[in-house]
Design a protein with these regions (language model features):
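DnaQ-like (DEDDh/DEDDy) 3′-5′ exonuclease domain used for proofreading
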Residues: 1-49, 56-94, 101-115, 120-123
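A general structural signal for short secondary-structure junctions and capping/turn motifs
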Residues: 2-4, 130, 180-183
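Structured core elements
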Residues: 70, 94, 139-141, 168, ...
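A short acidic (Asp/Glu
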Residues: 81-82, 149-153, 177-178
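Short secondary-structure boundary/capping segments
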Residues: 87, 107-112, 152-158, 181-185
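Conserved Class I SAM-dependent methyltransferase catalytic core
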Residues: 114-168
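Cysteine-dependent PTP/DSP-like catalytic domain, specifically the C-terminal lobe
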Residues: 165, 170-177
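Polar, glycine-rich mid-to-C-terminal structural blocks
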Residues: 172, 179-191
Length: 191
């Protein structure tokens, strides 16, 4: 009798009910540009210097020294739009997802049920995984509310052996050595 090896994974309600995303395109808004313009007519012929400069650069003036992009819009749709041209070519991605603290902000609800939050994060991290080079890294800022669930989700997508570390950073100096309670003034960067 042969058994299929099992792997450790995080499960939650709705995990496998992910919407199918169709390919997207990015459209530049000159009002929001920072001086370098992508030529919309050369779609598919560009490659960011982040990815090694393999394709022709459509940056006006031939400046290929710009290695970053700022994309305004829904992050899942933006990631999907990048997937076609940049799969396997991004060296470093940094995301700052909602911490799921229970607060309401102008642009998003930060008090989601854990399963809903994980269902929102999973497709984003899966696309980022496809975008990263073999030696690429993903840096995620997060707090205690979801950090440990997020770490396990990343282990599932990237493989546990690809976890580099968790950086703890203190965002407030209110804690003291003689405090009678635990300090809650820190966040994490999961790499």
């Amino acid at each position: 009798m042969t058994t299929k090896p099992q792997k450790l994974e995080l499960t939650w309600i709705g995990k496998d009910n992910q919407p199918k995303l169709e390919p997207r395109i990015l459209i530049e808004d000159p009002e929001r540009s920072y001086g370098h313009t992508l030529n919309p007519l050369s779609r598919g012929e560009y490659k960011s210097p982040l990815a090694g400069g393999k394709h022709k650069s459509p940056l006006l003036g031939g400046d290929s020294g710009v290695g970053n992009m700022l994309i305004h819009g829904d992050n899942l749709l933006a990631l999907k739009a990048l997937e076609q041209d940049f799969a396997g070519e991004i060296k470093c991605a940094c995301i700052d997802p909602p911490y799921n603290t229970g607060n309401a902000f102008e642009h998003y609800d930060d008090g989601l049920e854990h399963s809903i939050w994980l269902s929102l994060m999973k497709p984003r991290i899966e696309i980022i995984h496809k975008l990263l080079r073999d030696d690429g890294t993903l840096w995620i800022t997060i707090d205690d509310t979801e950090a440990h669930y997020l770490k396990i989700l990343c282990d599932e997508i990237f493989g546990r052996s690809n976890f580099f570390g968790a950086i703890t950073w203190q965002h407030s100096v209110q804690g003291k050595n003689d405090a009678k309670t635990l300090s809650l003034h820190h966040n994490y960067i999961i790499v």
